Amino acid sequence: MSIQRVSSKWTKTVVLQRSRTVNEYIPVTRQYDRQTLERMTELFELNYIKPDHGTYGNGVMRVKTVHTFSEPPTSDHSNAEEDITAESPLAESSSQDLETSSHQVTTYELQYGTKQEFYPTLDELHQALEERIQGHLYLIQQGIPLLKHEDLPFDLRVLTQKNLKNNWETTGILGRIAAPGKIITNIHGGGRLATFEELVLPHLQATGLQKLRSELYRLGIHTAVQLQKSFPRLKEIGIDIALDETGRPWILEVNTLPGIYAFGLLPDKEAYRRIKRYAIAYGRLPSKKKKTSRNAAKPQASSSKVKSRAR
């Protein structure tokens, strides 16, 4: 029986939101349109816009909403205002008048890759996004300000697999650090690998690190169990986890075809051997026996070709 894959981010999000336990970890996520863009930029300073179908961080964009206050226009009263001393009863009211005379200006910063663009209105931002979206389904998600390692944002990948007893088991956590100037941490986008301890320990004490590790291991299992209710042939998932500035974990995305070879680059080789053992058991990786039989068959096939040619 083949391993089930689910490519739609929106489909997976809807299923996960049905679990009260898992939903607490999911940032506000909606299907993209003009009205939703307006609402999300009002609610959150950062928002990420990403394709419903996509891998390796391709197509991900970030919108940052920037609020500033314009200076009040100068007038002939400026000299008179300079004569108002701090002790004057008019000083406080004059200061309040200056505040009310200024007005808030909102601009929008759009970033994709290392490129940044600025738009003075929401309509212009939406038009720029539509040109990149090109009619495809995109999602808009509340942006989580990531913890940083050496001034570079990072996130975590939690791997959960079916074990040899056909139960869900979280088998590994690795860290990914974004390349300078990038908004994504994906290795294909120039990010680099790190261990969970290397990234988290500077922000949390040892007891906090262990508590977070246990929480993520449980979250991996809860997430897999919830997804399996709708997709019964799932065998493995990779969860992209953001840690906000307080150390709170958030689920950014769940991948049903997670990369496993990156775990082999980490120091814990025993964990990697277990990951591969489970992947072989449920059919993700070929078994050693199959590899051996294939290799043995190749010389025989070539030998028969030689005989047929000789005839």
What are these regions, as identified by a protein language model?
Residues 1-5, 204, 211-214, 218, ...:
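C-terminal active-site "lid" helix and adjoining low-complexity regulatory extension at the edge
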Residues 1-66, 92:
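A conserved helix-loop-beta module that forms one wall/lid of the active-site cleft
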Residues 41, 53-55, 149-153, 233:
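A short catalytic or substrate-binding loop motif that flags glycine-/basic-rich loops and adjacent residues
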Residues 44, 73-193:
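Phosphate-binding site of ATP-dependent enzymes
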Residues 47, 169, 250-252:
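Protein kinase-like catalytic core scaffold
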Residues 64-65, 160-164, 241-245:
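Short, low-complexity Ser/Thr-rich regulatory SLiMs
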Residues 128-147, 181-242:
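A long amphipathic alpha-helix within ATP-dependent nucleotide-binding catalytic cores
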